[in-house]
């Protein structure tokens, strides 16, 4: 276990609540908290047994005045989250009492922790690897049961085990190549280009399977980026309110009411969906509305799914056709809204689009709502998304896998072109290094620091 100073931070969300928790971690955690803790039983906490609690008060270091009534728990390292001695102080919730307890612990000798520093120490002390550490934040940020289950599986080491198996197989290839090259006179089993190529192809298949899972995994982690588009007053904001089951967006008969994008999360069959209501797309001289239209177009560029709304009580015009031409090669659903009114649109103008993705809809009468949800589920909720724990959800992991794949492919080409196994071994080792970046074993320290700085304070 590495030696660090003792850190402290608030681990619960700031705000009024029944309880707040201040976490203290480090070699001196017990002795520091003992300076400001007065137990009801008149006992200090220096001799506390691990996994026990004490009831008492946190007092001012200077004069002994009571700050708050607390319960203190102790977990002795290395059998704690960080691998160090950890003390958690449970005080009354609320910004001021929590802040005062933390201030007094810092006065007693602790340092205010940096964002993610507790989890970083757990990683550096070998309590978890980097992919497991990242899963901690994924659990906190999960939006649905499916996304939480995926994050929990990663925190339990599902991805780590797959990566470690691949790295071990690559390491065995490297060891056999180096033994053959360095000790040709020894009576070793011959390693040929054909043998190595076969092993690498098997490894490539497994890497490809993990890469293929990444698109669905990204949806679980970050949400399905869904953009509602259409001309002004076709019902985009009304659709957002219907999906959220609340009045989140302002709805009026005045075109151009929505001038900026509105983003909210909804849950459809376990799929977290980040749904974006955009400004109506039309030619306008209004400067603010014009900016909103430009943002709408930017959101369309990065969307996983586009929901295009058409007012079916009006004829399809040039602006609609322009959007149809844009979305035809993307993932889309077309809602023919206002079917409760007289239908005037010419459906022949929709021939460029997949008829299975066109839904007759009425926000007002809730016609087509279930079909919309079913269509989204059929498009994105595959068997893997519903049942597979071994899924790549992190873009950083996908990029490392792509690098490993590239190195394996390059080494295979070298074997085919030259049959020289020693030349191929350089790229094979680079593939091993790339995979190690996922678990943190071969990642540079500055990149590790950057990852943990994105964590919340107190975690």
Swiss-Prot record:
GO cellular component, one term: cytosol
Pfam short name (any one): TrmE_N
Residues binding (6S)-5-formyl-5,6,7,8-tetrahydrofolate, per UniProt: 23, 88, 127, 459
Gene Ontology BP term (one): tRNA wobble uridine modification
A single MF term (Gene Ontology): GTP binding
Binding-site residues, K(+): 233, 252, 254, 257
Location relative to the cell: Cytoplasm
Principal subcellular localization: cytoplasm
Claim: Transcription regulation is one of the keywords in the record: no
Protein family membership: Belongs to the TRAFAC class TrmE-Era-EngA-EngB-Septin-like GTPase superfamily. TrmE GTPase family.
Assembly and interaction partners: Homodimer. Heterotetramer of two MnmE and two MnmG subunits.
UniProt-listed HAMAP family: GTPase_MnmE
Reported function: Exhibits a very high intrinsic GTPase hydrolysis rate. Involved in the addition of a carboxymethylaminomethyl (cmnm) group at the wobble position (U34) of certain tRNAs, forming tRNA-cmnm(5)s(2)U34.
Identification of the protein by name: tRNA modification GTPase MnmE
Gene source species: Clostridium acetobutylicum (strain ATCC 824 / DSM 792 / JCM 1419 / IAM 19013 / LMG 5710 / NBRC 13948 / NRRL B-527 / VKM B-1787 / 2291 / W)
Gene: mnmE
